[in-house]
């Protein structure tokens, strides 16, 4: 999935709300998104003993993602877009990733080693994109695991896990191997996240090589 490349198509859901919040400090909206991301991670961590929290956590992830997109739209419409705001947004995004993915990683839904690999994949994906910009190459959103993709997957898989528990199929069984549905999401983050990081690294290297020719 490459939902980050489709960001412009979400304007219909952002612009009307952004216009109503045009007098609100965009940084305040960023803080709300970060707090919601922390809450979602906490809900996922606690959800093994209360599976309904999976649904609540999924909803909170979606709302957090909405606020994450809304702050930039408000800043743009209000003429308050700045490098400081962009920097704060990137920092908060990384903390949000850690909160949301970390909540699953340390929960009983996930093998801790898999959780660690998923976090590495997610953080390296974002790092390789911003590091490209830091060295003077174009900022990269390329790959199969952008921020928007993570938000959508972190909304869908908790719902799948909840439905699986209710129907009596909490795991995907392959022979003697049983994997929670939430772990499938984490496997995707671990594998595709690191592949996306490598892909972005290769693209940046090629871009920098062209500049040096």
Predicted regions and their residues:
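Hydrophobic alpha-helical transmembrane segments
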Residues: 1-62, 100-213
């Amino acid at each position: 999935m490459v939902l980050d490349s489709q960001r412009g198509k979400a304007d219909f859901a952002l612009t009307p709300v952004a216009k109503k919040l045009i007098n609100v400090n965009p940084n305040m909206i960023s803080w709300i998104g970060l707090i919601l991301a922390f809450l979602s991670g906490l809900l996922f961590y606690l959800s093994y003993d209360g599976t309904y929290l999976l649904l609540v956590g999924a909803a909170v992830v979606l709302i957090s993602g909405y606020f994450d997109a809304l702050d930039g739209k408000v800043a743009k419409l209000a003429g308050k877009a700045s490098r400081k705001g962009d920097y704060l947004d990137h920092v908060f995004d990384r903390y949000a990733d850690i909160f949301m993915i970390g909540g699953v990683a340390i929960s009983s839904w996930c093998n801790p080693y898999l959780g660690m690999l998923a976090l590495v994949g997610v953080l390296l994906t974002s790092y390789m994109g911003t590091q490209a910009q830091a060295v003077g190459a174009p900022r990269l959103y390329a790959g199969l695991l952008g921020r928007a993709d993570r938000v959508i997957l972190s909304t869908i898989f908790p719902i799948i896990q909840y439905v699986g528990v209710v129907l009596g199929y909490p795991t995907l069984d392959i022979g003697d191997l049983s994997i929670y549905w939430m772990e499938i999401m984490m496997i995707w983050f671990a594998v595709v996240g690191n592949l996306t990081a490598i892909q972005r690294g290769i693209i940046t290297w090629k871009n920098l090589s062209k500049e040096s020719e």
